[in-house]
Amino acid sequence: MTPEQELLDGAALTVYRLNGQFLTIGDGLAAPAGISVAWWQVMAAVQQQPLPVAGIARAMGITRQSVQRVADLLVADCICEYRPNPAHKRAKLVAITEAGLAAIERIGPQHAAMAERLAAVLGPAEFAATVATLTRLSAALDTIIDGSDRG
């Protein structure tokens, strides 16, 4: 195996582990608000502005079908609602409701405490550098997936 392959494998395995750790932590944070981490992810995606299901899926890097399933459950529980999309008649917008905002607000104190704990372990500068590195890694993978790295 080449050094580059070893790095790719190491990065992938580390990110898979991180994903599992974040899901475990997220479920623990979300449960007292009566939601799952999957629900919280979709709610967070539309917290600032309504988005179509496809837009949420693109932003999260997951399938449209999985977002659609969660969005339907959120709408059924009145945590989100569908709104008309002026840009596309068939692709409704997912918007968070007051009940959804209240659920996210209930998560806030525990979320803040977890962020403080992680910052205390890593240190603020290393925490920020880690986020920047993960963001660059994601952008590099987007470039490869899009094929724009081939010139």
Predicted regions and their residues:
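Short, locally clustered residues in the helix-turn-helix/winged-helix DNA-binding domain
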Residues: A44-Q48, G108, T135
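C-terminal regulatory/oligomerization modules of transcriptional regulators
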Residues: M1-P3, A125-G151
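Alpha-helical linker/hinge and terminal dimerization helices associated
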Residues: L18, F22-I25, L29, M60, ...
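Charged, amphipathic alpha-helical coiled-coil/dimerization segments
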Residues: L23, D72-A132
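DNA-binding alpha-helical recognition surfaces that contact promoter or target DNA
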Residues: A44, R69, A132
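N-terminal helix-turn-helix DNA-binding core of bacterial DNA-binding proteins
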Residues: T24-S66
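N-terminal leader segment of winged-helix/HTH proteins
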Residues: M1-A33, A125
